[in-house]
Swiss-Prot record:
Pathway stated in the Swiss-Prot or TrEMBL entry: Carbohydrate degradation; 2-deoxy-D-ribose 1-phosphate degradation; D-glyceraldehyde 3-phosphate and acetaldehyde from 2-deoxy-alpha-D-ribose 1-phosphate: step 2/2
Biological classification of the source: Bacteria, Pseudomonadati, Pseudomonadota, Gammaproteobacteria, Enterobacterales
Active site feature: D102, K167, K201
NCBIfam families linked to this entry: deoC
UniProt keyword Ligase present: no
Quaternary organization: Monomer and homodimer.
Organism: Escherichia coli (strain K12)
Gene Ontology process terms (BP): 2-deoxyribose 1-phosphate catabolic process; carbohydrate catabolic process; deoxyribonucleotide catabolic process; DNA damage response; nucleobase-containing small molecule interconversion
Location relative to the cell: Cytoplasm
Classification via SMART domains: DeoC
Name used for this protein in its record: Deoxyribose-phosphate aldolase
Top-rank EC class of the record's enzyme: lyase
Post-translational modification N6-acetyllysine, affected residues: K167
Cross-referenced InterPro entries: Aldolase_TIM (IPR013785), DeoC (IPR011343), DeoC/FbaB/LacD_aldolase (IPR002915), DeoC_typeII (IPR023649)
Length: 259
């Protein structure tokens, strides 16, 4: 197996196969569930809006892949600093049956100098998630923070407040995941000594098998080859799947989506 094939198989099994579009429908989510079951293995999860969780749960069960996890998004994509709303949305997502919640950190508040609201928001959402055995991923929106010190600070605050994963991006802004921001975030995980309990998720802009290989190489360099499993590493993507399957000898690499 070539290096690209090996990394592509790894990446496929770490994917949060995503559709977060305004025109999402039950039919599109059902199709996403079907795509998550591939000839070479299942993706780790799907990521969808909360209202589609029941139909996704039903579809995953019917197709014999109930182990594929269901992730959803809250405080999304705006990252406002209203803790009550973020918490209400997170509780609603849990009630719908989410296995994982990806909440957007109030990044604009941090840029304006307020570190406390981000900590409090993540902590409140973490308490709700922990009570229901739901994983919490925190999206810090690196492409808007831009500054390395801010990316580092948002990562640190999220981890201190209880994040199970830190995630680069919503996929809804001009600049999403980059290898540079990924390295900064994973270095924070390393420097805080939390690599056993905190994972990393690049999202948006990871589109090709070669892209995925680059991101996995950073993780392997920092933590060793065994760290990037589904509890510690995910790719938030949709079009990536077709590229991975093509690298693995399945399909033509074409995809209908651009996340």
């Amino acid at each position: 197996m070539t290096d690209l094939k090996a990394s592509s198989l790894r990446a496929l099994k770490l994917m949060d196969l995503t559709t977060l579009n305004d025109d999402d429908t039950d039919e599109k989510v059902i199709a996403l569930c079907h795509q998550a079951k591939t000839p070479v293995g299942n993706t780790a999860a799907i990521c969808i809006y909360p209202r589609f969780i029941p139909i996704a749960r039903k579809t995953l069960k019917e197709q014999g892949t109930p182990e594929i996890r269901i992730a959803t998004v809250t405080n999304f994509p705006h990252g406002n600093d209203d803790i009550d709303i973020a918490l209400a949305e997170t509780r609603a997502a849990i009630a719908y049956g989410a296995d994982e919640v990806d909440v957007v950190f109030p990044y604009r508040a941090l840029m304006a100098g307020n570190e406390q609201v981000g900590f409090d928001l993540v902590k409140a959402c973490k308490e709700a998630c922990a009570a229901a055995n739901v994983l919490l991923k925190v999206i810090i929106e690196t492409g808007e923070l831009k500054d390395e010190a801010l990316i580092r600070k948002a990562s640190e605050i999220s981890i201190k407040a209880g994040a199970d994963f830190i995630k680069t991006s919503t996929g809804k802004v001009a600049v999403n995941a980059t290898p540079e921001s990924a390295r900064i975030m994973m270095e924070v995980i390393r420097d805080m000594g939390v690599e056993k309990t905190v994972g990393f998720k690049p999202a948006g802009g990871v589109r090709t098998a070669e892209d995925a290989q680059k991101y996995l190489a950073i993780a392997d360099e920092l933590f060793g080859a065994d760290w990037a499993d589904a509890r510690h590493y995910r790719f938030g993507a949709s079009s990536l799947l077709a590229s991975l399957l093509k690298a693995l000898g399945h399909g033509d690499g074409k995809s209908a989506s651009s996340y």
